[in-house]
Amino acid sequence: MAVTITLKTLQQQTFKIRMEPDETVKVLKEKIEAEKGRDAFPVAGQKLIYAGKILSDDVPIRDYRIDEKNFVVVMVTKAKTSPGTSVPSEASPTATPESSTSFPSAPASGMSHPPPTAREDKSPSEESAPTTSPESVSGSVPSSGSGGREEDAASTLVTGSEYETMLTEIMSMGYERERVVAALRASYNNPHRAVEYLLTGIPGSPEPEHGSVQESQVSEQPSTEAGENPLEFLRDQPQFQNMRQVIQQNPALLPALLQQLGQENPQLLQQISRHQEQFIQMLNEPPGELVDISDVEGEVGAIGEEAPQMNYIQVTPQEKEAIERLKALGFPESLVIQAYFACEKNENLAANFLLSQNFDDE
């Protein structure tokens, strides 16, 4: 039975595509290209995001269990056509999705990226960068081709009320507000760049001095051999196994669990952010025996550590009032809290989520 996929772009354009459940994500991309045009939506440049996850080309649509009431975000990355030697380096991230594996070097090179006021003066010297170290430049997107980025910013820059709308829109992909704000800041409020940074890593750590030493120690150790999964050590940890099973049962809980992990073990969260593809692949591995979310909440903070800790969620008075209003709809407190934090403390989204879950159960 055919399903209708609702798609939304970063410019708030919404359209629908009819798909057979057996058809793959690649077919969906081809249909998007056919409907919207190869110039605007080339298959090779499309990234489809649902519930904070990038959809893989060879996976059937039915495997992602896309709710027709929700939407899939379409992000298009285009090769820059600006003259000069910066063209090959700008085209490489879009032509080869695997280029994200070179991003562990991005924090080191990204820390020297020019401030906003110096963009125009820096562009000539920036264009010569690929001749010295093309590998690091392709990994550190903002430090190359700043002229091309200014063109992007001129056409897609968001400010004022549009900024808040865009912020909410990107958060709906499953990212924390703080990370979205940081990505928008690093991209000079260019939403395309911001989403790209969230997917591949935000260049330039907000804590360059004391944070860079710890990050280099974390990243150097696992990346000594090419092709090795730096997150392999998580596979044998029961806390991660339980977390994986819960996420597969309800992908909407991933942002809340990652937020909790960031509070308990920020270094591990940084490492996961640098290796999102491997982490998502591990999350998508076949689960074992099903577990309950209540068994996982207290274990998330213990991932990467030897012993679990007790974890408590702190809420403000306003957040408590929002939770009470959601409970008044007739849902149990435990389910309300899960939905509220899974929806990044957005009361309306949480209410819609709870109502849709209730409808599905009936």
Swiss-Prot record:
Record GO terms (molecular function): damaged DNA binding; polyubiquitin modification-dependent protein binding; proteasome binding; ubiquitin binding
Phosphoserine: residues carrying this PTM: S123, S128, S133, S136, S138, S205, S294, S356
Residues annotated as domain Ubiquitin-like: 1-81
Family: Belongs to the RAD23 family.
Function, as annotated: Multiubiquitin chain receptor involved in modulation of proteasomal degradation. Binds to 'Lys-48'-linked polyubiquitin chains in a length-dependent manner and with a lower affinity to 'Lys-63'-linked polyubiquitin chains. Proposed to be capable to bind simultaneously to the 26S proteasome and to polyubiquitinated substrates and to deliver ubiquitinated proteins to the proteasome.
Domain statement: The ubiquitin-like (UBL) and the UBA (ubiquitin-associated) domains interact intramolecularly in a highly dynamic manner, as each UBA domain competes for an overlapping UBL domain surface. Binding of ubiquitin or proteasome subunit PSMD4 disrupt the UBL-UBA domain interactions and drive RAD23A in to an open conformation.
Name of the molecule in the record: UV excision repair protein RAD23 homolog A
Annotated source species: Bos taurus (Bovine)
Source lineage: Eukaryota, Metazoa, Chordata, Craniata, Vertebrata
